[in-house]
């Protein structure tokens, strides 16, 4: 899931280990000083109400529940492949990036594994809901491949200047893309890219504008959300090829299935409902009042006691 389900590992002592020491024992000494000590139990009592500590316990619970239910269905190679992609992306900075996030390679692997287990659970439920109605809705919203040339710029005034040149008679749009575009993936190929309505390579605003163009038409400047917070990027699009949409839904059945499943994976409400059902099925019992509310985002509030109860035993 493009959205990370679990928060980055926290550099607190294991909440579970500390909890085991919280009843009937002060546990081991963590810190000693002249005339005093800080014990595991004392530390646990201090940190258990901390939101970060509560998130750790929530993550640990989700990890254990989904590992038990789906662990045998997930190949370790999927986790290793994701790690390899991240190493390729960050290069020699990978360990530093992990450290800054409070993670080691092993905790990152565990995080990725849990995310993939949740994705697997979501996929299973979503596939069971692949109704004719769902396919029809996806088909109605689907636009097949178009090929376009795009120019991406970071400055609106610059974009307006380039647009004027792009709309001039005899303009060489490909050369304008090579000379001006900030999109390194497409500029050397004259800005050419092929995408459909399900593609994620270009922003929604750009796709919408491209689909509305006739072949050889050039858009106005399109403003889209940038990759940095509160930033914008500016696009100019020339449509070079448009695929006629078939009226036969069966021609797109596999593509539509992928579209529907991807939408479900990106639907936070749907994902939360799946996590909630698995937590309920696991019959979770909260043993410390400090943690009684950590599951409410998944299994509701005070009336969820039938599946997640608090016990002082």
Swiss-Prot record:
Its EC number is 5.2.1.8. Residues 1-20 form the signal peptide. The keyword Transit peptide does not apply. A lipid is attached at residue 21 (S-diacylglycerol cysteine). It catalyses: [protein]-peptidylproline (omega=180) = [protein]-peptidylproline (omega=0). It is an enzyme of class 5 (isomerase). The keyword Cell membrane applies. A lipid is attached at residue 21 (N-palmitoyl cysteine). Gene3D superfamilies: 3.10.50.40. One of its GO terms (biological process) is protein folding. InterPro entries: Foldase_PrsA, PPIase_dom_sf, PPIase_PpiC, PrsA_foldase, Trigger_fact/SurA_dom_sf. It is found in: Cell membrane. GO terms for molecular function: peptidyl-prolyl cis-trans isomerase activity. Transmembrane segments: none annotated. One of its GO terms (cellular component) is plasma membrane. It comes from the Bacteria. It is a lipid-anchor. Keywords: Cell membrane, Isomerase, Lipoprotein, Membrane, Palmitate, Rotamase, Signal. Pfam families: Rotamase (PF00639). Residues 143-241 form the PpiC domain. NCBIfam families: PRK01326.1. Plays a major role in protein secretion by helping the post-translocational extracellular folding of several secreted proteins. Belongs to the PrsA family. This is Foldase protein PrsA. It comes from Streptococcus pneumoniae serotype 4 (strain ATCC BAA-334 / TIGR4). The lineage of its organism: Bacteria, Bacillati, Bacillota, Bacilli, Lactobacillales. The gene is prsA.
């Amino acid at each position: 899931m493009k959205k990370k389900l679990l928060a980055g590992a926290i550099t607190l002592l294991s909440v579970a280990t500390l909890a085991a020491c919280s009843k009937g024992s002060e546990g081991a000494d963590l810190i000693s000083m002249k005339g005093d000590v800080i014990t595991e139990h004392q530390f646990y009592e201090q940190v258990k109400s901390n939101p970060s500590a509560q998130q750790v316990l929530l993550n640990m619970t989700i990890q254990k529940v989904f590992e038990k239910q789906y662990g045998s269905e997930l190949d370790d190679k999927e986790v290793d492949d994701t790690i390899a992609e991240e190493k390729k992306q960050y290069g020699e900075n990978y360990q530093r990036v992990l450290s800054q996030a409070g993670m080691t390679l092993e905790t990152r692997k565990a995080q990725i594994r849990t995310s993939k287990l949740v994705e697997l659970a979501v996929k299973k439920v979503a596939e069971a809901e692949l109704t004719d109605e769902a396919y029809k809705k996806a088909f109605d919203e689907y636009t097949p491949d178009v090929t376009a040339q795009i120019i991406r710029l970071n400055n609106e005034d610059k974009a307006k200047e380039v647009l004027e040149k792009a709309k001039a008679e005899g303009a060489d749009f490909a050369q304008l893309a090579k000379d001006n575009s900030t999109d390194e993936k497409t500029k050397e190929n004259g800005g050419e890219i092929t995408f459909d309505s399900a593609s994620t390579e270009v922003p929604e605003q750009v796709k919408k504008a491209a689909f509305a163009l006739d072949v050889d038409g050039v858009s106005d400047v399109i403003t889209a959300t940038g990759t940095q917070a509160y930033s914008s990027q500016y696009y100019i699009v020339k449509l070079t090829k448009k695929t006629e949409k078939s009226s036969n839904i069966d021609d797109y059945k596999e593509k539509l299935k992928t579209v529907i499943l991807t939408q479900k994976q990106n639907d936070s409400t749907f994902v939360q409902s799946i996590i909630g059902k698995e937590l309920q099925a696991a019959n979770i019992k909260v043993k410390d009042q400090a943690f009684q509310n950590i599951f409410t985002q998944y299994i509701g509030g005070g009336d969820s006691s039938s599946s997640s109860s608090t016990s002082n035993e």
